[in-house]
C-alpha cells in the first residue's frame, strides 16, 4: 500500500460535477486540479484532496448487491476556520443555508451546511487554549 502522509483524500458522490466544482472553488477556496466533466473532478485545499464523483464515474456504479452510491448523509469533511462567525456571515451573504446554528462545545464551535448534492461540510473553529 502506498502511503502519502501529506495528503488526505476524500471522495464525495455528487449529482452535478460542474456545479460541485463551482461550489468548492467559489465558496470554500479549493483549487481545481483536474476534471473529466460530467464524470469526475479533483479539487484541493491545503492538504485535503476532494474527489468529486458524478453518476457517470466509475465510483457511481452500483455495488454487486444493487446498492447505488448516492450523495448526502452525515459523514463530512471538516474545514478549520479562524473565525466561524465571519465565515458563516460571508457564506450566508452568498445565499448558502445551514443545517443548524453554531454549536459551541469544549473543543470549539461548529456548524454544518451542504454542497449542491447534499453532502455535508463542517466549519470548525477550535477553542482558544
Regions found by a protein language model. Name each.
Residues 13:
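Catalytic core of Fe(II)/2-oxoglutarate
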Residues 1-8, 31-80, 88-114, 125-129:
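Vicinal oxygen chelate
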Residues 120-123:
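Short glycine-/small-residue motifs
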Residues 20-27, 91, 118:
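Conserved active-site tyrosine of GNAT-family acetyltransferases
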Amino acid at each position: 500500500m502506498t502511503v502519502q502522509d501529506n495528503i488526505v483524500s476524500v471522495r464525495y458522490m455528487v449529482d452535478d460535477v460542474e456545479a460541485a466544482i463551482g461550489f468548492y472553488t467559489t465558496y470554500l477556496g479549493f483549487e481545481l486540479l483536474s476534471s473529466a466533466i460530467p464524470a469526475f473532478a479533483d479539487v484541493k485545499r491545503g492538504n485535503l484532496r476532494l474527489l468529486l464523483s458524478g453518476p457517470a464515474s466509475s465510483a457511481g456504479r452500483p455495488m454487486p448487491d444493487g446498492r447505488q452510491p448516492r450523495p448526502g448523509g452525515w459523514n463530512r469533511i471538516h474545514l478549520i476556520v479562524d473565525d466561524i462567525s465571519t465565515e458563516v456571515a460571508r457564506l450566508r451573504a452568498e445565499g448558502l443555508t445551514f443545517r443548524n446554528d453554531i454549536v459551541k462545545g469544549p473543543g470549539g464551535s461548529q456548524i454544518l451546511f451542504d454542497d449542491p448534492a447534499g453532502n455535508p461540510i463542517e466549519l470548525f473553529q477550535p477553542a482558544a487554549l
